[in-house]
Structure formats: structure tokens, C-alpha cells
Amino acid sequence: VFTLGSYGYYPMGSGKLGGEAEPTEYPVMTVKTSQKTLLRAVTKDEYTGRSWRDTSSGRRYLYVNPRWRSLRQEVFLENMPAETVLKASNLLDQKAISIQMQNSAASTVFTPAYLRSLTTYGSMVPYFNEASELFITRDLISGDRYTVYAPVIEGGDASLGALVNAAPKNDPYYAQIAAKYTALPGHLEERVYQDMRSMIADAATPYEQACAILRHLQRYYRYTLSPVTPPENQDFVTYFLYVGKEGYCTYFASAMTVLCRMAGLPARYVEGFLAQPDSSGFAY
């Protein structure tokens, strides 16, 4: 299974957050895409204070098996949003994104968040799990290629807020989702909750609240590959917010997820890659 540790981002080992990152420089994949695309690898739902864990079922289901079609549609939100919402914006138009591996990697298949369909080539047999992660039955090797079809959405897009507002306000799955994806450990300090409330004070909708948290992190915290590592007895996100105030992707993603959950916004911690194409339409 994919881990950022294979690419130099878990120097503390065993998925423990923190430490000085040493990113690898070899190419992982080539991506043909018309715009900046976030490619998700793994999602995690439980925050311990020092790491993230995936507590979803370890069972995997054959992607093309009709028996699991309903589960696949639910996991990947294939039937969402409603047709009326789709017609309200072209933001959810499907794009073809072609990926070819340039080096060996774990069995995890990289895809955008809202996967609609997947075409694999050669001996790649895709499976999925209930965390909406995709895998094949072996490790990826150089030359493996596949095409995904999905809308390409970026948080903060001006038209995304309008799309969210057009969506139905009642979701039969919301209570179940919220219970799992707003859970936090009891040791988090009250001052973090107070500061979160200040961040979102002027935000009128859940989407605006998430954007307000994002802007706060972008404005007041610095990106670096050489941050100070929190002491063993301190919460990782709290230390980042109040002491270190600098870090790399795992720092910002952890803080964003925890703060969103504090605000009552269901959120998962996600790891993967950002594909940013050049003028030829390829990202490396």
C-alpha cells in the first residue's frame, strides 16, 4: 500500500508525523491532464495526536464485478450529485486523465477524488475498498498505464461554492459520515477550538468555513522541509499551530483536517500527488 514514507516524507518511521523530509528525486509517473490535478492514493480517518490511521475494513472488492456495483457507486459517489446539480455547472464535467508509471511503486492506484470510471491495460486488475482506495493485485511497475475519468475539482474554485449551494440540503448518509469523520481525540486543548471559531467567524456556509481555515493556514504558516519535530509528549497539530508554525504537506494536511473536524466539517486525511501539467499537457 502507498505511503509517503517511500518518498522521504515519514523520516520518523512507522507513519509517525514530523521530522526533516528528504524527498526522492526520481520520477514516479507521467500524467496527461488538461489542468492541475490532485491524485489521491490513501485516505485515513483516525487521528491519534502523533499519526493518522485507516480504520476502514481491509476487505477489497473487484472493481468490475457487477456484484459490487452498488457498493462501488456508494463508495465513489458515482450517483452524486443529483442531475439538477450537474446541469447547474460544468465544473463536474468528466475529464480523461492518462497515467503511466515511470518507476515501481506499491499496489495503490492514483486517482482523482470523484472517480467515475477506470480503464486499465495489460495485467492490471483493479480492486477497491470502502475507503474509496484503489489497488491492483501486484505492485505497480514502470510502464503500467491506465486512464481515469473524473471531474477535476480544486478547493477554493470560485464556482465551487455556488455548486455546493445548489446541492440538496438533506443527505441520508450525513449523520453516519459526520460521526466518523468529525471524531477527534479528547486531549486536544480548548484554545485550539477557540482559535478555530475565530477563523470561521465570518463564514456563512460549511464550504466558506473550510475555505477560511485554508486561507488561515496559507497566510500564517510557512512551508519548509526542515521543520522542528514536536516532543513525544505533545500533540502534533497543536505544536505546529502554536510553536513550530512551519512544515510540509503532512503538517498542513493534518492541521486542515483536524481544524475542519473541530468546526463540525466531516474531513479525511489524504496522501497522494499533485500533477501540474506543463505547456504540453504532461506532468512528471
Language-model segments: which ranges?
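Helix-boundary/low-complexity linker signature
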Residues: V1-Y284
